[in-house]
Regions:
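Catalytic-core environment of secreted peptidases
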Residues: 54, 66-98, 103
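An extended, acidic, His-containing surface patch that forms the Zn2+-binding/catalytic region
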Residues: 324-353
Length: 353
């Protein structure tokens, strides 16, 4: 690229952010654009229009990932920027969208200002990056990390299948197998993202240069006891599944301290009790356990510690314990060269980081 400093149109970028935020916004001001829902499809149509208006080459692959290409040459490795525009229920308006829209503005401004490029640029909005169907469908498809079995097994929390949801929007989920890109086709990938935590704010820093992507394990855990009348079953004679869950939740901090690292986190984000009546001892507690770290060895140690702790609690309380691995992603270190480039650029603009 030439040394000319890129000038972006911030009012235009702000207008795009506000326009996208209006799609799928509910009365509670949260945004509901779950993958392949009506809100998501409306947002995708809006983005396609903006890509075309920007003079970029519009492309959609078999996994329904959307691309806007500048100076496209299939024989040259490209620099890819972007994120996603699908959301979790009740999302904020910048999660994912900021990376896509800032990427759009950058490519649009480069084209308008006639900046010469050494290699092609691609804007991408990945499909189902928020994991409605367990995983990160669009980016995993691009990496060749899905199979026909995965596609047909993928379901959301309501039981709807990925193939069914995509078919309702005129899309064929099995076409995602054609979306795989070779590593040689990409020179670099850069994503701008809001911080989804308090660290930068607490430090008073404007920018965080990401060192790596945490690995993740997500389990569907079930503790099974005996449902009995809450008024007539003595405490010492109960096999209370919720008490087992409660004891395990208290143990999480200890397990992280003893077996985790400085960046380890673990969360119980969903709990279901059966039969779910106020006057019945819970006979089943089912919950989602998710834990993350930057080191694969730490994730292994945490897995072992969580499993052993749950087994011990179950034995002590007269419960049965089983779990299913719902999702598993390996940790990845970010490229040192790109990190240094982002850091030096931040320093040149006097951004504390």
């Amino acid at each position: 690229m030439s040394s000319n400093l890129l000038q972006v149109d911030f009012p235009r970028l702000k207008s795009d952010v506000e326009a996208l935020a209006a799609i799928g916004r509910a009365d509670d001001q949260g945004i509901y654009r779950m993958a392949f829902s009506e809100g998501d499809m409306q947002a995708r149509s809006w983005l396609q229009e903006r890509i075309v208006q920007a003079g970029l080459e519009l492309y959609q692959d078999g996994a329904a990932n959307l691309f806007g290409r500048l100076a496209w040459d299939p024989d040259k490795p490209s620099v890819m920027v972007g994120s996603h525009i699908d959301t979790v229920p009740g999302a904020g308006h910048l999660d994912g969208a900021l990376g896509v829209l800032c990427g759009l503005e950058a490519l649009r401004s480069m084209k308008e200002q006639g900046i010469s490029l050494k290699r092609p640029l691609e804007l991408v909005a990945f499909s189902d990056e928020e994991g409605r169907f367990s995983g990160m469908f669009g980016s995993q498809a691009l990496c060749g990390d899905i199979s026909p079995q995965w596609i047909h097994a993928a379901r959301d929390l309501s039981g709807m299948g990925l193939t069914e949801a995509m078919a309702a929007q005129g899309l064929d989920a099995t076409e995602a197998l054609s979306a795989a890109r070779s590593p040689e086709s990409l020179h670099a990938f850069v994503e701008l993202h809001i911080e989804q935590g308090p660290v930068l704010d607490e430090l008073g820093s404007s920018i965080g240069v990401v060192e790596g992507i945490c690995g993740l394990k997500r389990w569907d855990v079930r503790l099974t006891g005996v449902a009995n009348h809450a008024g007539t079953t003595p405490m010492l004679m109960r096999s209370d599944a919720f008490q087992g869950l409660a004891e395990f939740s208290v143990e999480i901090d200890r397990i992280l301290e003893e077996h985790g690292g400085p960046q380890s986190v673990a969360t119980i984000g969903r709990v279901e009790l059966q039969p779910g009546a106020a006057n019945v001892v819970p006979g089943e507690a089912r919950f989602a356990l998710e834990f993350r770290d930057l080191e694969a060895s730490v994730l292994y140690d945490l897995s072992d510690a969580f499993r052993r702790t749950l087994s011990a609690i179950a034995r002590r309380r007269g419960l049965m314990f089983d779990f299913k691995v719902v999702s598993e992603l390996v940790p990845v270190s970010c490229d040192q060269r790109i990190r240094q480039l982002i850091e030096s650029t931040a320093q040149s603009f006097a951004y504390n980081h």
